[in-house]
Amino acid sequence: MDKKTARLRRAAKTRHKIHELGVVRLTVHRTPKHIYVQIIKPADGNVVASASTVESMLKQQLKNTGNKEAAITVGKTIAERAKAKGIAKVAFDRSGYKYHGRVKALADAAREGGLQF
């Protein structure tokens, strides 16, 4: 089993558990250059709010889009957008990535912004 297959297996397991709970989930996708985050409703799978380093507003604020500082900015942004939509509690879906580095920085920033995991 290669690295990507193992990550996808972990992600599927986590998503199944979150789906059984029926709560709103905060899902993260990470690439070497960018980080993306979405808040997804459990019932219909619709995206309620999203943020990423690809957005021009965030890109202008950042010197580099693939580091912890960028993840912190995205975490704060998603927390603001979730509050605006009336969402305070989410389940954190790290998509099989280790809770370390940029993923951890994003989660901590979202918590500081007012989201509860």
From Swiss-Prot:
Keywords: Ribonucleoprotein, Ribosomal protein, RNA-binding, rRNA-binding. Pfam families: Ribosomal_L18p. GO terms for biological process: translation. SUPFAM superfamilies: Translational machinery components (SSF53137). The keyword Cell inner membrane does not apply. GO terms for molecular function: 5S rRNA binding; structural constituent of ribosome. One of its GO terms (cellular component) is cytosolic large ribosomal subunit. This is one of the proteins that bind and probably mediate the attachment of the 5S RNA into the large ribosomal subunit, where it forms part of the central protuberance. Belongs to the universal ribosomal protein uL18 family. Part of the 50S ribosomal subunit; part of the 5S rRNA/L5/L18/L25 subcomplex. Contacts the 5S and 23S rRNAs. This is Large ribosomal subunit protein uL18. It comes from Nitrosococcus oceani (strain ATCC 19707 / BCRC 17464 / JCM 30415 / NCIMB 11848 / C-107). The gene is rplR.
